[in-house]
């Protein structure tokens, strides 16, 4: 495996998530600054919009309007051309916990995950689903039985959705039907079934990987943020680990492929994901390293 040198892109944040490379710029959110940011040509992160109920997943409609998940009120918001942030979809009834990550397909269909339970409040783990939000703002549940669906990507041919199951010890995938709904879930990479165990501590103890953020490359492999082991790993379908980027003592919580040639791996780093600690400190930062295989698919 290659040796990776890490660069710091930006630092001094609370907890970064949702990295995206869009229109030749790096975008991301800070949960606890409650902002969506874009890194400008001078390498400075500019706050684009404030999301009071905590921003998460990002994406763009075909007309270039930005969508952002508002976590705590379980909405998808749209940044209009005039700078107004409006409700694109209210998905409260479809979520059993905070709304979280999102991927927006080239046709404008958005797929949104949610926690499934009160993670920060210490509740028992419960499986949950994925919500499809159409360009007109209508929504429906299109998958169920996922263990904290998190990072998602859509293949370059727009026929497959791949999703991390953070507390499921696996990466799953679905066929995308012509109407935007999803087929049956199947494994992309499974590191051992954890079943219906409700105790989150036991699930984590029995897991070998905690797959958070996700990025797809042109060879069909995925980079994932492995929050359990302070690393980003490149995995081929079937579960073989091809490359490892060690980031200790930082944990990695989201990843993206970008840069002008699509061969820069961006990694959202922080000491942990504890809400109280990350709110109180500004140790969150964005790391990067060059990789050999470039970006594919969406985002």
Language model features by range: what are they?
Residues 174-181, 291-296:
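Short loop/turn segments immediately following beta-strands, especially the blade-tip
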Residues 35-37, 75-77, 128-131, 170-172, ...:
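A short loop-to-beta-strand structural motif that recurs across blades of beta-propeller domains
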Residues 256-299:
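Blade-level signature of beta-propeller repeat domains, shared across WD40, Kelch, NHL, RCC1
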Residues 1-12, 39-43, 185-189, 198, ...:
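A short helix->beta-strand "capping" segment at the edge of beta-propeller domains
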Residues 10-24, 51-70, 75, 93-110, ...:
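Beta-rich, blade/repeat-based domains predominating
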Residues 23, 39-41, 46, 62-63, ...:
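Flexible "stalk/tail and boundary" regions
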Residues 31-32, 71-72, 117-128, 166-169, ...:
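Short, solvent-exposed loop/turn segments at conserved positions within beta-propeller repeat blades
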Residues 7, 46-50, 86-90, 140-144, ...:
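Beta-propeller fold detector
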